[in-house]
């Protein structure tokens, strides 16, 4: 373990982080730990699972710890990662933007049901937050303005 002369592994750090975040009352502590460590290591979640026995460098731990501390204080994972997926598209998010919510995807699904391809020529998105609705509708209805 850490401090005994051996670098901690991905598995060990994820276990410690999950426990810490659980104590702090964070939502989805395991998922939070995985997403944050994957970000630091430049991996997706599958890559992280495949790297469970990989030791972590001091530099990687130094990049991870501040993110975990911020998550422990309640900061949303999306802000820590700087992005959030919405309807298959990645959006940049900061504390200055609203985080796209999964239930908002229902609006896009409903628009796709109501308007056959080519039928929607104009739409407006007011108070856009992250802009996820307008961008996603523009992708799904490229002829619309």
Show which residues each predicted segment covers.
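Non-catalytic accessory regions of SAM-dependent methyltransferases
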Residues: 1-49, 54-56
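Short, glycine- and charge-enriched coil/turn segments that flank and shape catalytic ligand pockets
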Residues: 4-7, 54-63, 113-122, 143
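Residues at secondary-structure transition points
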Residues: 8, 31, 98-102, 125-128
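A general structural signal for well-ordered alpha-helical segments in protein cores
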Residues: 14, 33-34, 64, 77, ...
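N-terminal hydrophobic or amphipathic segments with adjacent small-residue motifs
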Residues: 19, 27, 68, 76, ...
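Short, polar/charged, Gly/Pro-enriched helix-capping and turn/loop motifs at alpha-helix termini
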Residues: 24, 47, 78, 118-121, ...
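Conserved AdoMet
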Residues: 30, 37-113
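Conserved SAM/SAH cofactor-binding pocket of Class I
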Residues: 105-145
